[in-house]
């Protein structure tokens, strides 16, 4: 893990994804106890927080991420497909929780546009069905996110981004969850 770490100026380290991740996914299937490999690699690593950004599909890499974490943060876009996919996702989380007893989960709403009434209605529906599992913070839709990705910058390096405050609030809310 230490060989892959990229130091940043902002006081956090990254391990970026690349084309080799596809090979890693394939190679995991032939390994014994493959769902625990990431957890084992992270043991003894001295960080306050480790954030694992997984793909939304249920791959072996995603399972490894869920097995290695204490808190799964699940972004939900306020549209009908998110609502329809929640039961399948909950089934997956419950299966993983059999092996990772300490796993908790929280959802947060992302790509939210308050100008669209359907988004507000779907947000209410998500909050009603998931109750306290949905964090209060919503991440507003912001073109600066796409621009930052294209420029290989963090959102915090983008001027005039309206979602910087959203992400800061989300970070505080997540830290509070981790303390409980």
PLM regions with names:
Residues 1-46, 149-153:
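P-loop/Walker-type NTP enzyme "switch/lid" segment
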Residues 62-79:
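Inter-motif core of Ras-like GTPase G domains
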Residues 113, 123-153:
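Beta-strand-loop-alpha "switch" segments that mediate conformational coupling across diverse proteins
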Residues 148-166:
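C-terminal boundary of histidine-terminating zinc-finger modules
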């Amino acid at each position: 893990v230490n060989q892959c770490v990229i130091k940043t100026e902002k006081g956090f380290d990254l391990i970026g994804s690349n084309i080799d991740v596809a090979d890693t996914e394939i190679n995991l299937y032939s390994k014994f106890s493959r769902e625990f490999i990431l957890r084992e690699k992270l043991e003894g690593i001295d960080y306050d927080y480790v954030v694992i950004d997984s793909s939304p599909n249920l791959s072996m890499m995603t399972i490894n991420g869920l097995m290695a974490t204490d808190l799964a943060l699940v972004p939900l876009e306020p549209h009908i497909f998110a609502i329809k996919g929640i039961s399948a996702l909950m089934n997956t989380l419950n299966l993983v929780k059999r092996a990772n007893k300490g796993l908790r989960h929280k959802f947060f709403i992302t790509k939210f546009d308050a100008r669209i009434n359907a988004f507000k209605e779907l947000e209410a529906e998500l909050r009603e069905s998931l109750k306290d599992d949905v964090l209060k913070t919503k991440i507003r839709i912001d073109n600066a996110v796409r621009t930052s990705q294209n420029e290989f910058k963090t959102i915090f390096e983008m001027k005039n981004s309206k979602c910087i405050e959203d992400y800061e609030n989300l970070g505080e809310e997540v830290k509070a969850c981790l303390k409980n």
